[in-house]
Design a protein with these regions (language model features):
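Hydrophobic anchor at the beta1->P-loop junction of P-loop NTPases
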Residues: 236, 264
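Pre-ATPase regulatory/linker segments immediately N-terminal to the P-loop/RecA-like helicase/translocase core
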Residues: 2-14, 76-226, 281, 299-322, ...
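Hydrophobic positions on the alpha1 helix immediately C-terminal to the Walker A/P-loop
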Residues: 247, 251
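A helicase ATPase "motif cassette" and its flanking acidic/Ser/Thr-rich regulatory loops
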Residues: 1-81, 101-116
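Conserved P-loop NTPase motor core of helicases/translocases
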Residues: 200, 206-208, 253, 261, ...
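Conserved helicase motor core of SF1/SF2 NTP-dependent helicases
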Residues: 258-260, 268, 282, 358, ...
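Conserved lysine of the Walker
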Residues: 244
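Walker A (P-loop) phosphate-binding loop of P-loop NTPases
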Residues: 241
Length: 659
């Protein structure tokens, strides 16, 4: 593909991204108008009412306000570093309706009761005329960056204040900016990579003897060497449980033998946290731009803010910043001496900031951030020889170009047979926005790709179906875990169809129920059976053994409404009380990158037409069925699901295992 053609392709990407931006913004607007605060609270998108804590200036001299969640503390929330938020108040009428709705919810055990009973008309919800940005979240405590002039609006409010997620304009604008830069690039490394990534021209390689890594398996060792040989691009394709992170950490370590510093990015904060933690465990000096999602002292110590505040010059800088703020508040005496003093203080503050940042960045070997975080002003003007992008198969191409503009070569790692990027616009999806940079390069530059071929997570029979269906049978199971299980003579995979299960006989089976655009679908009978089957399996294992060996469980459903209903059922069933810390309940997306000893999946869909909605996204199901180490239990109506060839093959595979 010529230079003109690569530019045309990226211009098309920009048009598709614009469609997605408009679709997501419109969907957010409609959701905000249609959904009451009570439903947003239950979805984890809002906290209300807040307890407002202290305000302070952070290391970037931004005003930060501490707020605390006071209700629904058992609800998993969606607030994390970098997300935009808006504060609001409710009228007395709105507060009264929330109270009534919560009472109704407790009575009928319905996860949508709040949503059905709380009106969200404009007269009841009063949004404050500014936005904030989440800086830090730890359980029910959140720190939000807010405009200093609006702090009193929150702190002195006579009525309770709440906070909810707002539409994320920043991420889109950052991606649009990245595309504009790469389209405009001429005669530089970015222009070279742009043209290379849209052509079949072979990527360039170094030539030197392969290195040995006896602690890695053969495909992992090959992947590390391919990364070291790559002048332009290398791709690590890591199916579930194959040690992708282990391989990347080794490759980063070896790269740092040749380069002074590398940039490591991922689509999500959680993935950045994970690889950063593994690098820290190997003794690498990591500087984390942004705050971690999982708060622990080890990782907090590697964040930019903590490093900045721990610097010996920070107390002096803090005192100067305070003096500047106090000087600005003076209403009298703003003469020439005032301006001279202000300029001296500003100059000294800038000098100290530069010195502190130079030392912090000079000491770090790895700079870690999300893809959007790579546009942070702290990185402005910084160049890297190599950028590593993990989760590359979950990131829009435009997002990958954000860190790419800072580097000479790129290492992509991920699995395009697992979760794809989320695209809400049907037109954008049809136009190809969902096809990632990694997926495209796998197609046109297969010699740059290394498939990791040995998995260390699952019983061989759990992995076999996924290996055959998605990876051409190339992924094998490590001998040491090939036949591990919880119980002797246990079948590692089972499928129960609610209407065909003897103990239910289908008599109390209600099938699927549609509960609104934002909640999706729910199947109460299947949810009850899911927990019944889990309880039966726990009884087979034995309570004491589960507690002693910390046997953990993941309960997965593709539908958020079913997840919420399952959480409620577990919290109300006394049998599971001793095991609460061992049981996680979440959507498929929420379990990406995780694993459990036991996984039980509630499929939800149950109709005569064989309609399965987004269960047709087989990459999502690949994630679901590959989370289990030793036991996988599937609950789903076979009459509905097996009309689709994938589920028919999966069901037949499981039946063959049963003999």
């Amino acid at each position: 593909m010529s230079e003109v053609s690569s530019i045309q392709a990226l211009q098309q990407q920009r048009l598709l991204l614009q469609l997605e931006y408009q679709a997501e913004k419109e969907a957010f607007r409609k959701q905000t108008e249609a959904m009451g605060i009570g439903r947003k609270i239950k979805r984890g998108d809002a906290w209300y009412p807040l307890r407002v804590g202290k305000g302070f200036y952070n290391s970037l001299n931004q005003y930060a306000l501490e707020v605390f969640r006071t209700t629904d503390t058992d609800t998993e929330h969606n607030f994390e570093f970098g997300k935009p938020v808006v504060f609001f108040r409710l009228s007395a009428k709105g507060n009264q309706k929330i109270a009534v709705a919560k009472n109704n919810q407790n009575k009928d055990n319905n996860p949508t009761a709040t949503a059905q009973n709380v009106d969200s008309s404009a007269t009841e919800v009063q949004y404050m005329k500014f936005t904030g940005t989440v800086s830090y979240v730890d359980g029910d405590r959140m720190v939000v960056i807010v405009p200093e002039g609006h702090v009193l609006d929150i702190q002195s409010s006579e009525t309770p204040v709440g906070v909810q997620l707002s539409f994320d304009e920043t991420s889109y604008q950052t991606m649009f900016d990245a595309l504009a830069r790469v389209i405009a690039a001429k005669g530089n490394r970015m222009a070279y990579l742009r043209n290379l990534f849209y052509s079949t021209t072979p990527a360039e390689r170094f030539s030197f003897e392969a290195m040995r890594f006896p602690w890695l398996n053969a495909s992992q060792e090959k992947a590390v060497n391919e990364i070291l040989w790559a002048k332009d691009v290398a791709i690590v394709h890591g199916p579930p449980g194959t040690g992708k992170t282990t391989t990347l950490v080794e490759a980063i370590n070896e790269t740092l033998m040749r380069e002074s510093q590398v940039l490591v990015c991922a689509q999500s904060n959680m993935a950045v946290d994970w690889i950063s933690e593994k690098l820290v465990d190997r003794g690498v000096n990591v500087l984390r731009i942004g705050n971690p999602t999982r708060v622990n002292d080890k990782m907090l110590g590697f964040t930019y803010e903590r490093r900045f505040e721990a610097h010996a010059d920070y107390p002096q800088l803090w005192a100067i910043r305070k003096a500047i703020r106090e000087l600005r508040q003076q209403k009298k005496g703003r003469d020439e001496r005032f301006h001279q003093k202000m300029e001296r203080l500003k100059s000294r503050a800038a000098e100290l900031e530069i010195r502190i940042n130079t030392e912090i960045f000079g000491e770090a070997r790895v700079i870690a951030s999300t893809l959007v975080g790579a546009a942070h002003r702290l990185l402005e003007g910084r160049r890297f020889e190599t950028v590593f992008i993990d989760e590359a198969a979950q990131a829009l191409e435009a997002a990958c170009w954000i860190p790419l503009r800072r580097a000479s070569r790129v290492i992509l790692a991920g699995d395009h047979c697992q979760l794809p990027p989320t695209v809400k616009s049907i037109a954008a999806l049809k136009g190809g926005l969902g096809k990632t940079l990694m997926e495209r390069l796998v197609d046109i530059k297969p010699t740059c790709v290394t498939l990791l071929q040995t998995q260390y997570r699952m019983h061989e029979q759990i992995m076999r179906f996924s290996s055959d269906y998605f990876y051409g049978g190339k992924v094998e199971t490590a001998p040491q875990i090939k036949y591990r299980g919880i119980l002797d003579y246990d079948i590692p995979i089972e499928w129960y169809s609610p209407k065909e299960t003897p103990e239910t006989d289908g008599s109390d089976h209600t099938g699927e129920t549609f509960v609104g655009d934002t909640y999706g679908r729910i199947n109460k009978g299947e949810a009850q059976l899911t927990l019944d089957k889990l309880q039966q399996y726990f009884n087979k294992i034995g309570k004491q053994r589960i507690l002693d060996e910390r046997i953990d469980v993941g309960v997965i459903s593709p539908y958020r409404a079913q997840v919420q209903y399952l959480r409620q059922l577990i919290s109300k069933r006394d049998f599971f009380k001793p095991f609460r810390k061992l049981i996680s309940v979440n959507t498929v997306d929420g379990f990406q990158g995780q694993e459990r000893d036991i996984i039980i999946i509630s499929m939800v869909r149950d109709n005569e037409q064989g309609q399965i909605g987004f269960l047709r996204d087989l990459r999502r199901m690949n994630v679901a069925i590959t989370r289990a180490r030793m036991k996988l239990i599937i609950l789903g109506n076979t009459a509905t699901l097996t009309k689709h060839p994938f589920y028919r093959q999966l069901y037949e595979y499981i039946q063959e295992l049963k003999g």
